[in-house]
């Protein structure tokens, strides 16, 4: 097993978002420093082990394994975005992970969990997306991420969701023109359900 110092050095070489470091430090009741290296150096052993086992070793040892892996994937996909975990949105609720642009506009929302999703959880997420898109016009992507789940039943139900296209485009609301006629550009989000396999 690697020493704490070796783990910190390996983690420092990876671009770990500040939002993830803050989340793990808070969860493990660890102190933080200013900047990534300072924060990693000051984090307690459990926090370092959590990050290391999920990011470097790819070991599913903890409940937040998928959250850590998903966050790291988002960093590679949306490189200039800031990450926020358990992000509160007034009058809508919390989103598990969001990516924010430089103006703090929400551009990506993600819900992830280790176990199988129930349809009511997906339906609730979709309802929150409809409301959020009305406020956050820069929102372009939404992901539901699960681990080793059978998603066939949920995928079949997604086909029946109003505005959900077979190509993954989710139209949250048609824009209304003059006299209530449909016109203008609709509110669209790229919606994907991802399954991480072990």
Listing of model-derived features with the role each one plays in the protein:
Residues 1-198:
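Intrinsically disordered, low-complexity Ser/Thr/Pro/Gly-rich regulatory segments
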